[in-house]
Amino acid sequence: TAGMLTGCGSDDKAKDKDAYRQYGINCIENGSYDDAVDAFQKALDQSVGSVGAEELDICYYKAKAQYLSGDVDGAIDTYTAIIDYNKDSDAYYLRGCIYFAKNDSDKGLKDFKTALSENDDNYELYLGVYETLSKYGMNDQGKEYLDNALKLKAKTADDYMQRGRIYTMLGDYDSAIKSLQKAIDEKLVKANYYMGEVYQKKGDNDSSQKYFKKYLDSGEVDSYELMNMGQAQMDNGNYDTAITYFQNALELESVPNKQQITKAMIIAYEYSGDFATAKSKMEEYMKDYPDDEDAAREYQFLETR
């Protein structure tokens, strides 16, 4: 793709920028993170000094690709450049997440606090901070952020949905259901997904599947949510249903977590007893992701079945 591109006039540069950006996104989805970084940099090179919403969007993608490629310091530098330009709360939050991954919790916490000071009524930001702190063993500190989020006043259907998510994380399922129902009553389709999660945690698989199906039928579902639905079915031993969710995810136009979904689907085939399909899918997987050592060992096992 890159070899076909030329940068002549400004219109050509705009087309090149869009093409490089899309190529970079495709590379991320295929696990080719170094190629993605190169593509995003080439996209930025077409901008000739101008910085707008599209350039910032490309910078976010570039930082993500850098992190996934193992260039943690490069990702930090890219987020820092965004922060220097416009103090964006998302950049502070994402840089904070990387600091935690580097075991630098002090810098991470500082970035989280700055992110929330820039955007203190963003429920998703509070949720993201909680999930990161919980991941790194700071669950109690994370819950303080959730408690602070619940002090905000819900104004929109999305606010009620986010509050439902928070109550779910705190284990207050009755309050979660009440908040999510308000969002559903206001026609926010995605709230059905989180309602399904609540009932899943309550052990009510029938109700969980009812809400998951409502969301699935809406056509708004993304690959991460479909993977979570599939994993929930795996946990309940419903491997054929799980495979259907994974297949639906892989058929979407954008599948940034393609590798994880494909791997989960292979395991589902294996658990269902369909070793022939599991082996066939694993052969395809190994061609696409030859560096996955765990998958190589799993393939050796499947060859013996």
Label the model's feature ranges.
Residues 46, 50, 84-85, 118, ...:
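Structural marker of alpha-solenoid helical repeat scaffolds
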Residues 29-30, 68, 101-102, 135-136, ...:
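Register position in tetratricopeptide repeats
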Residues 18, 52-57, 90, 124, ...:
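Start-of-helix register in tetratricopeptide repeats
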Residues 4-7:
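C-terminal motif of bacterial Sec signal peptides marking the signal peptidase cleavage site
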